Amino acid sequence: MSILTRWLLIPPVNARLIGRYRDYRRHGASAFSATLGCFWMILAWIFIPLEHPRWQRIRAEHKNLYPHINASRPRPLDPVRYLIQTCWLLIGTSRKETPKPRRRAFSGLQNIRGRYHQWMNELPERVSHKTQHLDEKKELGHLSAGARRLILGIIVTFSLILALICVTQPFNPLAQFIFLMLLWGVALIVRRMPGRFSALMLIVLSLTVSCRYIWWRYTSTLNWDDPVSLVCGLILLFAETYAWIVLVLGYFQVVWPLNRQPVPLPKDMSLWPSVDIFVPTYNEDLNVVKNIIYASLGIDWPKDKLNIWILDDGGREEFRQFAQNVGVKYIARTTHEHAKAGNINNALKYAKGEFVSIFDCDHVPTRSFLQMTMGWFLKEKQLAMMQTPHHFFSPDPFERNLGRFRKTPNEGTLFYGLVQDGNDMWDATFFCGSCAVIRRKPLDEIGGIAVETVTEDAHTSLRLHRRGYTSAYMRIPQAAGLATESLSAHIGQRIRWARGMVQIFRLDNPLTGKGLKFAQRLCYVNAMFHFLSGIPRLIFLTAPLAFLLLHAYIIYAPALMIALFVLPHMIHASLTNSKIQGKYRHSFWSEIYETVLAWYIAPPTLVALINPHKGKFNVTAKGGLVEEEYVDWVISRPYIFLVLLNLVGVAVGIWRYFYGPPTEMLTVVVSMVWVFYNLIVLGGAVAVSVESKQVRRSHRVEMTMPAAIAREDGHLFSCTVQDFSDGGLGIKINGQAQILEGQKVNLLLKRGQQEYVFPTQVARVMGNEVGLKLMPLTTQQHIDFVQCTFARADTWALWQDSYPEDKPLESLLDILKLGFRGYRHLAEFAPSSVKGIFRVLTSLVSWVVSFIPRRPERSETAQPSDQALAQQ
């Protein structure tokens, strides 16, 4: 190139061009790409006045306007990317930067829109104000109870007839489209309304569309003339029926969360009952157990009415010695039947308190735990059990491996944030094995903790409900623990839960037997059905292959009718769940969670349905390390198999599209879209199986807390604790912190009105941020540190409120990125024999994605004007 440019260009220009070529090469561009980049630059200088101030401004904003194009490392087709992105910018900015006269022309519409939103926000309060007199006045109060029941029965019967007509009425495509547009319009209007009314309306609309869909599937979409199509269609219909049942039961379960608040205790402490705290342990490390014991010693409860027990099923001498040193009671069994349930039942023989509180050995209670929960027991004498959330201060495998800790609600947030609150409305709260209080009298009546299944907690609450006792749930986190450290451990835990719930379904079916209310039966059945999702999920992941590979019509209907029934069913369900579950489960994430577990929970649940006594109990390991990033090939093997199977479907689908009958082209397209969606979800499952590093033995907890540090010369610095762990803290100094580097300082923390001092060493200094390492502590200092940090009453209360609201489209984009990330990991960690295949595929997808236009990043100077415009 140098010879040609030296001949064509003057020396100064040639020198600059050679310098640019070398710069391209230095940033990793190939010789061909660098040469072509220089050629494009010459053409740009010839035809575009790049020296003009306007073009100079565009070049200065290159990183914001063209975020996906690296100007220092050109690629051969960058001009095409520039062209597509420029067109996108012109179209996008033309909508946003509307001239002022035009804005005024549409100001009337903007005012109407603003008034509409204001009216929708004020509507619930207006309705409440207009109808508050009805709370005191009963319109049918003058009638007898029998007459009121008759009127209610007539209304319900009439409503059911209307619903049946609405669901079963056949429509032609145009009528179906108009009907769906009406429902969709109502949904878009209602979803913006705050309060429970909008959620109830969305549930009604979703059920209407979904019931029409399932009716249509049963009556119009099975091919009875082709055995292969019939069998495949029935298999898919089975999975869809399961999903529809779970959808309906799920709506019922969370239709009106109770959101129970604490009841104050009597001022006379002599009326407070005695409580035994049980901490069962088997093979956990003593360092894991210490924190819960130290925190329990500081619980705000009369010391003469509080007994703490270590239930050691491992019979370890170091645990016995530790219990003796800190002044708690210790029990070790000589036999170990029935695992955790047997361990607790053995301790019940020795404990004599009126109530028993159970904690897994990694759950650390706050000091307010008993004061927040015990008031309800004194108010309601039939209350047998109070459950609080299982909160985790360490990331679970999904959060850690995907880098989503405290950015996206984790897998358990939906259950403890919404489902249990919904169960509480129907008096169907489940005992979850930890972070709960149980009244001894009902527990003794049912013979202690249930031992017939491996999920002894849920079975115990079922037995209490059968006896006529009530349960309660308080959504305020009052304890926190360690999440599972690896995906394999997480899956093992879920396998045990799935097998146990199916065992209960077989051995003590909530649909049969005495003692349960109808609503309780439905809530228990839905919980058990949830763990039967393995087989239906696998069916959904392979269903489109039936047509592509076997030419089986699993939905025997025109593609237009499939779109008119399937898409509204999915969209309404997604919209409704986004409204109800927004803070607790973001859209499309259930697909990832269920896909990861599907292959592994399907066999044990099927075995438990056939033989409920088969299987064994396994203990979930906590507190482990992951020293190097790696792909868990054993866990990911099923996902990779499904990926390869779907890729075969893609290849066959492409062949069918070009060489198959023209009448099937639209059906092939629909099937291919389904396959690509499955590939995205499977890619997400693969991404989860890449274990990220976890080299900290002590997990850091983010928290803002005032504190102070004192140097050895007595000089004090006020500071704010930003995070803490069992081994140190991160603080922010009000001022320069460089003078503290390497020094030994005392950390001052407050608990109530009392101040505690802890010796620390400054481990790092970055600006005004300081990392402190705890020096060796005495037992009493360790107790005080745990009670000043982990056991503070307000430590976990606001964590659930930190999650952003669900935005379905953004969530879908996250899932797309997650799926692509999974395939990149396969290319990175795959064996050398197949690494080339994955690398080619991911490179091809990355190359295609590189042409997609991006939304430009906003500059700092543009933000105030945009905000001002929004306020105007």
Task: Locate the predicted segments by residue.
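A conserved acidic beta->alpha catalytic loop
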Residues: 312-319, 335-336
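Cell-envelope/extracellular polymer assembly enzymes that use nucleotide-activated donors
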Residues: 274-276, 307, 459
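Long helical/loop segments within the catalytic core of UDP-sugar-dependent glycosyltransferases
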Residues: 253, 331-355, 367-454, 465-466, ...
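The conserved acidic donor/metal-binding loop of glycosyltransferases
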Residues: 360-364
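Structured alpha-helical
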Residues: 7-8, 13-15, 25, 629-872
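N-terminal membrane-anchoring/stem segments of glycan-assembly enzymes
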Residues: 2-271, 523, 533-537, 659-689, ...
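Short, acidic, metal-binding catalytic loop of nucleotide-sugar glycosyltransferases
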Residues: 294-305
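Catalytic donor-sugar/metal-binding loop of nucleotide-sugar-dependent glycosyltransferases
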Residues: 463-479
